A protein has these predicted regions:
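Basic, flexible Lys/Arg- and Gly-enriched helix-loop patches that mediate nucleic-acid binding at interfaces
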Residues: 1-238
Length: 238
């Protein structure tokens, strides 16, 4: 069945309808090798639809979920040491899904899982620089100097990070709760940033990836991502 191109592109999870219209206007969309125009229709089952040379297809058969990973679980599908794995929490998903990125065993919060390899690869590719936001708890009060250091580039495993966005959410004599947004996903990056700053990190929770927020999802629980959330993520990783 033929449908407007922007509707097909949106339903495939590539972009919102408005963004799809811009792709069409800019000549990035082809149907069967011919550059498409705004207002064109196509049949995704019989026509070859490409954006920047990449063929798009239906997304209905894929699964996309978010999990609130609790502390103490490893972000793997199995573990030779017998540690709790995230698979213990998603047995009722019904499909074999894989984590997009990682959270270390002692971190918690938002984790995306899917069986869509192309989607996962786009989301993780360094060129897209999707912002990841964490809440971090450190011992004691956080000084102005420490905040300035956290906002500066760090040398982590031979890689120079981009400046982070850091805000104080709560502070008392015993601890400070920070919001830290980073643009890379280096291994244990925030832990190493705190260590180099001289801060003792006691808790780390990822609360957002781009505009996708963990919200009120309880630890150990998962839910399917909405079509709107998938469109937002797709726009951010193009």
């Amino acid at each position: 069945m033929k449908e407007r191109l922007q509707k097909i592109i949106s339903a495939a999870g590539v972009a919102s309808r408005r963004a799809a219209e811009e792709f069409i206007k800019s000549g990035k969309v082809t149907v069967n090798g011919k550059t498409a125009e705004l207002g064109d229709s196509a049949d995704i089952d019989t026509d070859i639809i490409c954006i920047d040379g990449q063929t798009i297809g239906r997304r209905a058969d894929n699964t996309y979920i978010m999990l609130n990973k609790p502390r103490g679980y490893v972000t793997t599908l199995s573990d030779e040491k017998g540690r709790p794995c995230i698979t213990d929490l998603i047995k009722d998903v019904g499909k074999r899904v894989y984590p997009v990125g990682r959270l270390d065993m002692y971190s918690e919060g938002l984790l995306i899982l899917t069986d869509d390899g192309d989607f996962a690869n786009r989301l993780m590719h360094p060129s897209h620089e999707i912002t990841k936001t964490y809440h971090a708890w450190v011992n004691g009060k956080c000084s102005v100097a420490a905040l300035d250091r956290l906002r500066s580039p760090f040398d982590i495993d031979g890689y120079k990070t981009k400046p982070a966005e850091v805000e104080i959410l709560y502070s008392c004599d015993d601890y400070t709760q920070l919001s830290i947004s980073i643009h890379e996903g280096r291994n244990r990056q925030i832990r190493k940033m705190c260590e180099q700053t001289g801060l003792k990190l006691t808790k780390l929770k990822r609360v957002a990836e781009g505009k996708l927020e963990l919200g009120a999802l309880k630890p150990g629980k998962w839910r399917v991502l909405t079509e709107q959330e998938l469109q937002v993520l797709s726009e951010e990783n193009r």
